[in-house]
């Protein structure tokens, strides 16, 4: 039995929970809203996370609850669990640990018509009708498309639908938009979760607005479950502007764009559905068409239907491959949070800790009031500057779950804090080095301030079984803290799930292998999210010292790993030693001094073993961890590269010959243009080929002339659309106001690609183009440098990346003055320079090749 969602009734007296039972039926259950909290009481039968006695106070109604809470707060009395919303209390009480059943998921995509004289319709101005909606129901494995024929095809009927479309979907031809919307609401009646691509800011609010306009005033409420609350808009800042997002109740709406971003481990150069589909589902490319969607709808209605269907089929394909919505459901239910909470940063972790406190530890948690924002950011991950250049046979070791491991090793948890050294990290260093300099300790419970020599404090901490972090925060090791206890449980569960995944793989059970892989992935996400949550002031267990202690301790742990590698390979405990190439967060890259993959891998494994053997003594000596906790930190051998270029922090390119102990032949890119930029795929693939050949040992004298030839080909292209420089643009609206104001100084501060976007929008007005989209904040654009200024100000023009072919006026007035030389430099020379100059290699030019051939040929 799984819950879909839970809401508090309008009068706050009931909690409504929608449930999908074991028979697949959706029902609604109502519970009395629980109103209670705990207060300190020496005779109380409950205890808090610090072991103090507390007692529970129950209230008959919300008014009594809030009045009592206010009274206790005004009297300075600590409260427990008064800030947990009733719906979360109900979910925890009734659904924790329950088996998770399948929910009904529906993917959909809408297509909207527009008037060429008015331009594109939007949520703010939803004047145009919905032309078609493609739907995929996961439960029934059915694809359905609802479509209204254009005025150019008034006699189009069901019989006119081509067979290839009928083979792919159930097509329902609607007489008008009213019928289409009515049928859409009927289709989603049994859907628990609806999902589209960028549906939060377009599809869902647009359907809501059109239903209210075309059907009746509150028809859009059908997006919610019956007997639920009415939807409402919330404002979200996006790309520097405020946008409206519709919040629905009962039925869950998950924007798959957000889901994908949230769960996908690696950043993508572009999150346009077309690019994601090309990357993830090459067999399901987004369909392309010539001209505008306006023309496609009227001139080729059949292809228009295919286009709509394909977008929804892509969403199905992504979920089939990634299982991200299924993961979101399982993750939320394991912590008894709402499904939409998975897209946030703290609620799932918070709910999981509260459940652990209740059901594993039998304790209650204190209220939390978010402190005022200081505007300060705590230190992030540690990076060791690279030895820039090309290195042969390098390898890396990686710390297992670095931040969760540190929190477990030092028992980092709010209730475990015993005090803070005023000198922070300086005090930590002095105590580690057993200095006789005085440091000052501020006792947590009493605020008492005590100064004593660092070496004396070391003995005191050791005697009391207290650990010290890299921040100088002191944690009691006597009783396991709530956060380390949760992390230990998750770590053990992940280990068990990975074991079961391996057993299923050995048994040839693909379904169970996939299930356990997803379960271990959820635990990985939970483990990695805890540190970030602890640094969020809205987190119930927030204390910035928890996050800072973790990162600064992590720095020392990483430094030790680098020094230990140097000790093994160079005989000196010094991370500046020759062997150390680079370090980042939890990984160290180092020279193996070998000349073949097997020897390099063997050496890397030996180094890893030596690191692991050194950690117990290091953790005990440096942080005063007890014997058990000193065993937690572990490193794993990660990669071996026969040739790689280390460029700068977070920028490197490696050809791998081994990965996780297995011999491979593949590339690893970090930060470099062919990994992070939105270069046209044709150019990106070509540059990647040049780099791969270089790192596999091919002579640059052979590759260089091919680079020059490739640039010549680009320069000679008649079609300049391939030469646009990809950019993301923000604050277009704000900067347009500045531009139109005539403020000379203000205009100078407008970024070049934003200026180019303003020019595009001006051209739409000048040429009377209502078919091409305007560039707005958040748009992806292609920028073209020009050989001369336009209006004495514009040196480039942008084109929206969403359109396949620019309008005729662009080719007539701008294509002839595109600066091809500048564009090729930006697309080829500049990215290549970033990637190869660190190895002492120059980007080849025709002039340079002719000169060298003349001298040495």
Feature map (PLM): residue ranges:
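C-terminal, non-catalytic extensions of nucleic-acid polymerases
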Residues: 605-608, 612-857
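DnaQ-like (DEDDh/DEDDy) 3′-5′ exonuclease domain used for proofreading
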Residues: 1-190, 219, 309-310, 314-333, ...
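Common nucleic-acid-contacting/processivity interface regions adjacent to the catalytic cores
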Residues: 291-415, 420-421, 509-564, 582, ...
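Catalytic palm subdomain of template-directed nucleic-acid polymerases
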Residues: 588-607
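Proline-aspartate-enriched helix->loop->beta-strand connector
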Residues: 184-207
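Active-site-proximal helix-loop-helix substrate-binding element of RNase H-like nuclease domains
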Residues: 142-148, 152-171, 175, 194, ...
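Non-transmembrane amphipathic alpha-helical segments
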Residues: 487-504, 523
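Active-site palm subdomain of RNA-directed nucleic acid polymerases
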Residues: 285, 558-585
């Amino acid at each position: 039995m799984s819950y879909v969602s839970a809401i508090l009734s309008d009068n706050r007296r009931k909690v409504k929970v929608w449930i999908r039972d074991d028979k697949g039926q959706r029902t609604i259950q109502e519970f009395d809203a629980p109103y209670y909290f705990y207060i300190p009481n020496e005779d109380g039968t409950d205890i808090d996370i610090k072991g103090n006695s507390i007692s529970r106070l129950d209230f008959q109604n919300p008014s009594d609850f809030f009045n009592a809470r206010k009274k206790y707060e005004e009297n300075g009395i600590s409260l427990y669990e008064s800030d947990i919303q009733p719906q979360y209390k109900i979910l925890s009480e009734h659904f924790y640990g329950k088996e998770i059943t399948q929910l009904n998921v529906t993917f959909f995509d809408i297509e909207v018509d527009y008037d060429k004289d008015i331009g594109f319709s939007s949520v703010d101005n939803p004047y145009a009708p919905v032309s078609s909606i493609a739907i995929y129901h996961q439960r029934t494995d059915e694809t359905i498309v609802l479509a209204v024929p254009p005025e150019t095809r008034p006699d189009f009927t069901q019989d006119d639908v081509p067979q290839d479309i009928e083979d792919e979907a159930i097509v329902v031809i609607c007489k008008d938009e009213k019928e289409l919307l009515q049928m859409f609401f009927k289709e989603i009646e049994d859907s628990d979760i609806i999902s589209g691509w960028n549906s939060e800011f377009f599809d869902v609010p647009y359907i809501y607005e059109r239903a209210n306009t075309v059907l009746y005033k509150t028809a859009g409420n059908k997006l919610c479950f019956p007997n639920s609350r009415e939807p409402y808009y919330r404002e979200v800042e996006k790309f520097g502007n405020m946008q409206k997002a519709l919040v629905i109740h009962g039925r869950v709406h998950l924007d798959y764009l957000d889901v994908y971003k949230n769960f996908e481990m690696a950043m993508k150069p572009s999150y346009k559905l077309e690019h994601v589909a090309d990357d993830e589902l090459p067999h399901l490319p987004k369909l392309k068409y010539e001209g505008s969607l306006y023309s496609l709808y009227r001139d080729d209605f059949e292809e228009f239907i295919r286009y709509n269907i394909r977008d929804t089929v892509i969403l199905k394909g992504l979920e089939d491959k990634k299982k991200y919505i299924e993961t979101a459901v399982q993750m939320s239910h394991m912590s008894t949070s709402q499904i939409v909470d998975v897209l946030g940063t703290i609620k799932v972790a918070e709910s999981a800790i509260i459940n652990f406190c209740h059901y594993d530890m039998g304790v209650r948690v204190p209220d939390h009031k978010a402190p005022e924002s200081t505007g300060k950011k705590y230190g992030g991950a540690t990076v060791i500057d690279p030895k820039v250049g090309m290195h042969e046979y390098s390898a890396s070791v990686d710390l297992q779950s670095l931040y969760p491991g540190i929190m477990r090793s030092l028992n980092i948890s709010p209730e475990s804090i015993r005090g803070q050294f005023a000198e922070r990290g300086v005090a930590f260093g002095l105590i580690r080095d057993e200095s006789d300099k005085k440091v000052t300790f501020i006792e947590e419970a009493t605020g008492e301030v005590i100064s004593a020599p660092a070496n004396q404090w070391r003995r005191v901490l050791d005697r009391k079984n207290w650990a010290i972090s890299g921040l100088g925060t002191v944690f009691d090791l006597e009783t396991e803290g709530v956060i380390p206890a949760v992390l230990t449980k998750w770590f053990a569960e992940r280990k068990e799930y990975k074991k079961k995944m391996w057993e299923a793989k050995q048994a040839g059970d693909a379904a169970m292998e996939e299930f356990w892989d997803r379960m271990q992935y959820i635990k990985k996400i939970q483990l990695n999210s805890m540190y970030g949550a602890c640094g969020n002031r809205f987190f119930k267990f927030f204390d910035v010292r928890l996050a800072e202690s973790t990162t600064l301790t992590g720095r020392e742990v990483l430094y030790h790993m680098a020094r230990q590698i140097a000790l093994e390979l160079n005989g000196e405990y010094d991370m500046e030693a020759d062997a150390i190439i680079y370090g980042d967060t939890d990984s160290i890259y180092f020279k193996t001094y070998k000349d073949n993959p097997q020897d390099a891998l063997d050496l890397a494994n030996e180094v890893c073993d030596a690191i692991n053997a050194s950690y117990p003594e290091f953790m005990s000596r440096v942080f005063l961890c007890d014997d058990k906790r000193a065993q937690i930190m572990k490193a794993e051998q990660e990669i071996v590269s026969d040739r790689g270029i280390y460029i700068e922090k977070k920028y490197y390119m490696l050809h791998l010959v081994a990965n996780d102990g297995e011999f491979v032949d593949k590339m690893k890119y970090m930060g470099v243009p062919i990994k992070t930029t939105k270069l046209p795929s044709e150019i990106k693939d070509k540059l990647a080929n040049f780099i791969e050949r270089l790192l596999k040992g091919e002579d640059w004298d052979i590759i260089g002339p091919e680079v020059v030839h490739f640039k010549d080909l680009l320069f000679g292209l008649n079609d300049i659309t391939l030469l646009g420089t990809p950019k993301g643009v923000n604050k277009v609206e704000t900067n347009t106001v500045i531009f139109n104001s005539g403020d000379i100084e203000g205009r100078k501060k407008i970024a070049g690609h934003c200026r180019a976007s303003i020019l595009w929008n001006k051209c739409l007005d000048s040429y009377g183009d209502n078919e091409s989209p305007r560039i707005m904040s958040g748009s992806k654009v292609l920028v073209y440098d020009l050989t001369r200024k336009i209006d004495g100000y514009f040196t480039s023009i942008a084109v929206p990346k969403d359109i396949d072919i620019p309008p005729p006026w662009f080719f007539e007035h701008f294509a002839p003055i595109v600066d091809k030389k500048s564009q090729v430099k930006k697309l080829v020379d500049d990215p290549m320079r970033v990637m190869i100059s660190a190895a002492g290699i120059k980007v080849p030019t025709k002039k340079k090749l002719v000169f060298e051939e003349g001298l040495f040929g």
